[in-house]
């Protein structure tokens, strides 16, 4: 009876995929991108459904996590956009702090 149970078990489909970090080098139509991986191979990446439905923008120069199938290593699914270290938001907040400091010094 245990033999039947073991034969019915399904493997996790995520086991057949490998995750890498990469850099978007080129934006192509229909949510496709050329991504340079850490090991300097360039593959074709497409946006996952969650990123598409969340309308997260992916641009050239963005760092992304990409999931690649072991069976076809020429394509991968972009599953996460990594945050920028030099993001625009942090620069904007520094500018507003500088403005506050200059206003305080004038008073």
From Swiss-Prot:
Q: Give start-end positions of Basic and acidic residues composition bias.
A: 83-107
Q: Does the keyword Transmembrane helix apply?
A: no
Q: Name one GO molecular function term.
A: translation initiation factor activity
Superkingdom of origin: Eukaryota
PROSITE patterns this protein is in? S1_IF1_TYPE
Cross-referenced Pfam families:
eIF-1a (PF01176)
Keywords, comma-separated and alphabetical: Chloroplast, Initiation factor, Plastid, Protein biosynthesis, RNA-binding, rRNA-binding
This entry carries the following GO cellular component terms, namely: chloroplast; cytosol
Chain residue ranges for the region called Disordered: 81-107
Q: Per the database record, which ranges form the S1-like domain? A: 8-83
User: Which SUPFAM superfamilies has this protein been placed in?
Assistant: Nucleic acid-binding proteins
- What is its subcellular localisation? Plastid, Chloroplast
* Main localisation: plastid
Gene3D superfamilies associated with the record: Nucleic acid-binding proteins (2.40.50.140)
Family the entry assigns: Belongs to the IF-1 family.
HAMAP family given for it? IF_1
Q: How does it assemble?
A: Component of the 30S ribosomal translation pre-initiation complex which assembles on the 30S ribosome in the order IF-2 and IF-3, IF-1 and N-formylmethionyl-tRNA(fMet); mRNA recruitment can occur at any time during PIC assembly.
Q: Which NCBIfam families match?
A: infA
What the protein does? One of the essential components for the initiation of protein synthesis. Stabilizes the binding of IF-2 and IF-3 on the 30S subunit to which N-formylmethionyl-tRNA(fMet) subsequently binds. Helps modulate mRNA selection, yielding the 30S pre-initiation complex (PIC). Upon addition of the 50S ribosomal subunit IF-1, IF-2 and IF-3 are released leaving the mature 70S translation initiation complex.
Question: Can you name this protein?
Answer: Translation initiation factor IF-1, chloroplastic
The record lists the organism as Zea mays (Maize)
Gene this protein is translated from: infA
